[in-house]
Amino acid sequence: TNSKEGEFIAEGGGVRGPRIVERXQSAC
């Protein structure tokens, strides 16, 4: 999860990173 969180944060996810990751996995 650290890799995905790092990527989202790098893109500018910040605090929303982990939440977006969870939604993305559920959507997929």
From Swiss-Prot:
Mainly resides where? secreted
Look up keyword Disulfide bond and say if it applies.
Answer: yes
Record GO biological process: adaptive immune response; blood coagulation; innate immune response
Write down which residues bear the modification named Phosphoserine: S3
Residue ranges annotated as transmembrane are: none
What post-translational modification information does the record give? Conversion of fibrinogen to fibrin is triggered by thrombin, which cleaves fibrinopeptides A and B from alpha and beta chains, and thus exposes the N-terminal polymerization sites responsible for the formation of the soft clot. The soft clot is converted into the hard clot by factor XIIIA which catalyzes the epsilon-(gamma-glutamyl)lysine cross-linking between gamma chains (stronger) and between alpha chains (weaker) of different monomers. Forms F13A-mediated cross-links between a glutamine and the epsilon-amino group of a lysine residue, forming fibronectin-fibrinogen heteropolymers.
Q: Which UniProt keywords apply?
A: Adaptive immunity, Blood coagulation, Coiled coil, Disulfide bond, Hemostasis, Immunity, Innate immunity, Phosphoprotein, Secreted
Could you tell me where this protein is found in the cell? Secreted
Q: What the protein does? A: Cleaved by the protease thrombin to yield monomers which, together with fibrinogen beta (FGB) and fibrinogen gamma (FGG), polymerize to form an insoluble fibrin matrix. Fibrin has a major function in hemostasis as one of the primary components of blood clots. In addition, functions during the early stages of wound repair to stabilize the lesion and guide cell migration during re-epithelialization. Was originally thought to be essential for platelet aggregation, based on in vitro studies using anticoagulated blood.
Annotated protein name in UniProt: Fibrinogen alpha chain
Organism from which the protein derives: Canis lupus familiaris (Dog)
